[in-house]
Amino acid sequence: MRHAHPTNIVVHLRPIDQRRIAQLRERTETPRTSADVWYIHTVLTQCFLPYTDQKDRRDWTRQNGTYSIILTAGAIRDPRHPREVREVGLPFGAKPRLFQSYANTQAVKQQSPVIPVERSMTALMKTLGFSITGGHKGTIASFKEQITRFARCHFTVVAPGPRGTERYINAPPIKQFDVWFPANTDHEPYWPTEIVLTDEYYSSLKDHAVPYDFRALKAIQNKPRAQDIYLWLTQRLCRIPYNKPLLMRWKDLYAMFGGQSTLKKFKQNFPADLAAARASYPEARIEEHGEGYLFRNSTPPIPKTKVIVKK
């Protein structure tokens, strides 16, 4: 068994991955400001969105321990054909992940379920670190589609119930979401002035908000699995008992982070994603193990403080 110090974790990586991880570490070495502290609901650090397009699939589920999340794709009214309803797919990739973090962060910092949004879609995309390109296949169109999918997706949390039952909890995060479509179809569509979280989600968020360094997620915006690993590490390592490390076998890691890949492919790619996540979390104490990885109690990147609610 070998301790995985910050430099050891990249020993088995390709040279190009080692260079990328060194660059990620440099980006977060500067002092952190309050603007760099973002928040995410603890459930979203344990049950994740798809990594790739699920095409015509209308549902998605992931399990972590005794909890599961079920996503069901929604639909919208096509503004070009008011009498028709268009199905939208499941959200996937980095864009909806960063958007949900933005919404959670604004709710916590503003202490309100009513979230002010940047004045335009491009302004919000720049805040999240995405490049801006137009056209049918550009990043603006892709971002709009992913956020629409996220806003219309139905969330269900499955938790242990009494006497061996399973409890299904409907937990849609967004209650209201307005999109303005300008009359000029060539004009760039503007983002809504605000979105509104459901009362239930906002109440839960106040008690279960996990702080993290947004620069870490922004630096790995093209690696959604690495983003998920980073967020999971931020809330999980600090809760592991000092004298009882957590062994995550490959099958357990695959169940959480595998997505649609095969186990063989996952085992090839996971070390690079873990190294990318750890580049911004050098305090993470992780050891390679023949059956997977051993995780030890570690100081969180940002200490959790209770969210104070204004009366």
Go through each PLM region and give its residues.
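Charged, alpha-helix-forming regions
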Residues: 1-311
